[in-house]
């Protein structure tokens, strides 16, 4: 008989479990990326990297770079070859797989001609079979905008406004004003607007007294690039003479126009001054983009608002007298509101403001009736194609107002109002009920419904 050493069953089981826990799964790995964000300027290329640990070949793995959804990769490789037809929208032709050192598990994504929309987090995922690990890489996109331009607009009553403008920034920059001794000055208004390309246009306004002799500076700072653009203006050099020498006159009353017709905005210099060598800008709320810009004898198309492209023309017959008329063709409801007409030279402007009222007279009302179960009657008056929102009123045969049961207004794609109003009638002796729909400027359409024989 052979004697065997005594081992407890529980001890054997514990030892076996320990061995299992200390043996790594054959697919066990992790992924690491850069500790700091990757900074890239708009228009340049960005290189994002990640590393498989422990280091080993990725030849038989699936590797993908993606933003938020793994099923929509920026780029993906499987078994050493790119999987085509999958690039996320916006990255076609710009995302490139870089052969960094795939034998050691190092991969890289190059994004060409970086855009503002590329800013943000990316994920690098390695997958082998059903086992995967990933890490995130932060791409910070930045763009240094243009040198600021400070222009002066005269407001009268001892005050002027300084407007600091610049374009081409990303992300949104920080803007501040300083006086001659470096003291901070508070902005009157700030507008930082992203353009179609994702870059920010900056427009900050400062109010000052026009008898000031200070030098004032506008600073625009990029936190991402840690760089500043600045501009300085000495108020005493311009305001005493140029702003006081001329004023701009516009319409004193709002200009009403119907949808589809042409809007005419006329403004002129007083006293009469030849404006051929001046810059003239028609604006809405901001300096840029503009409704229409005239400079150096021609229209500056590159500064025009998208919604006005192809719809404006300039009448310059009296430009030698300082008079110009802007025509806005095919008026829309969105054209309603205030416009600013600026005449300027060398960054000094005077302005006038003109209000435009856009209206649309709708269809002739249509009245239909419905007999109710209780013996009463409900009249429904409908019409469409109105702007602005019209006033609706029911009147009896003597012209007295009758309270409506309900009123409903809906706006369609062109912002025109559709009207529906209900009237409950219980008095069978009532005849000649009128539905009236009118605009604030007095335009009115009516329909009459004779209530007889019921």
Curated annotation (Swiss-Prot):
Tissue: Highly expressed in intestine and at reduced levels in lung and stomach. Also expressed in thymus, spleen, lymph nodes, T-cells, B-cells, and macrophages.
Record topological domains on the Extracellular side: 24-454
Glycosylation sites per record: 210, 296, 427, 432
Membrane topology: Single-pass type II membrane protein
Chain segments annotated as transmembrane: 7-23
Keywords recorded for this protein, A-Z: Disulfide bond, Glycoprotein, Immunoglobulin domain, Membrane, Repeat, Signal-anchor, Transmembrane, Transmembrane helix
Subcellular location: Membrane
A single GO BP: negative regulation of T cell receptor signaling pathway
Domain Ig-like V-type: 27-140, 148-234, 244-355, 365-452
Source superkingdom: Eukaryota
Disulfide linkage: 50-124, 164-218, 267-341, 381-435
Annotated family: Belongs to the immunoglobulin superfamily. BTN/MOG family.
Name recorded for this polypeptide: Butyrophilin-like protein 2
UniProt organism field: Mus musculus (Mouse)
